[in-house]
Structures are given as C-alpha cells and as structure tokens.
Design a protein with these regions (language model features):
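Alpha/beta-hydrolase-fold enzymes
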Residues: 1-57, 63
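Short helix/strand-capping connector loops at secondary-structure junctions
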Residues: 113-125
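Short, surface-exposed linear patches
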Residues: 13-22, 96-99, 127-130
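Serine-hydrolase catalytic core
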Residues: 38-114, 129-144
Length: 147
C-alpha cells in the first residue's frame, strides 16, 4: 500500500487532522461485509481517526530511497485495485534496489468471479478463494528462485 485510491486520502497527513478529519469523514467508517467470513473475521466498523497512522506511514515510506533496498521483494497486486493505487505500487517496485526479476518481482493475479470485486485482497478464503492455491504456489516458486 503505497497510495490510497481516494482523492481525499491526502488529508490524512494534514496538520491537526485528528481534530477536524472526523467532521469530514464522520466519526466512524463502516462498510457492509461481502460475505459471512468477512462479517465474522474482519473489522467492518472503526474510528475514522484510525486511518491517520496509515496515512503517515504511507507518506514516510514514499519518502524513502527504495533504490537502497536490496532485500528480495515480491509485489503481487492487481492493476485494477480499487482500494490502493496500483500505479504507486508499480512506481515503488520499479525503484527497488536491483534488476527486475531478481529482487523486485511482479506477479499478476488472475481474478475471477467470486474473487474480490475490488481487486484488492487477491488471495485468501474470505475474499479471493479462487486465487489462494495459485498464490501459494507462486510464492513458493519465487522463494526457490531467490535461494
């Protein structure tokens, strides 16, 4: 998550946002769960100010020199993500500190009906069950490649 896919996300890091942001966003952020698993295991209601640390973290991480990062990284995300900015993730991946395919590897999920319609949670039994086996195999294969 290197950029929130919402034009109002920038206010998360504005001065004194903890005081006035709830006036704009409301005190609580809520969403309707997509299925029983999400209703049971996910937080579907939380204080709007809980998003402020995420905004600060995104700002701080984007300010880093990612060219210095030599740790292998697998970026597995959808270009159609409606929650975060896929182009921001791609920008960071391209800046990562080694050649493409060795340290910063890109994987593309093949989302199908029944998977997350927001293309954000690209694996897992609750949101994208059709992707989980493929992602596990992809991660294990990637780990073998970088050994």
């Amino acid at each position: 998550n290197y950029g929130i896919n919402n034009p109002f996300a920038r206010i998360l890091t504005w001065p004194a946002a903890r005081t006035w942001a709830p006036w704009i966003a409301g005190d609580t952020i809520r969403f309707a769960p997509r299925n029983d698993g999400q209703a049971k295991y996910w937080t579907t209601s939380y204080p709007s100010v809980a998003t402020l640390p995420m905004g600060a973290l995104i700002k701080a991480v984007n300010a880093l020199d990612h060219g210095l990062f030599l740790t292998p990284a697998l970026f597995w995300y959808s270009d159609n993500d409606q929650v975060v900015q896929a182009e921001a993730t791609d920008r960071i991946r391209r800046q990562w500190g080694a050649d493409w395919g060795t340290v910063a590897t890109r994987a593309y999920p093949d989302l199908q009906p029944g998977d997350d319609p927001a293309a954000h949670v690209v694996a897992g039994a609750i949101m994208s069950p059709g992707q989980t086996d493929m992602m596990v195999a992809g991660i294990l294969g990637w780990l073998k490649e970088i050994e």
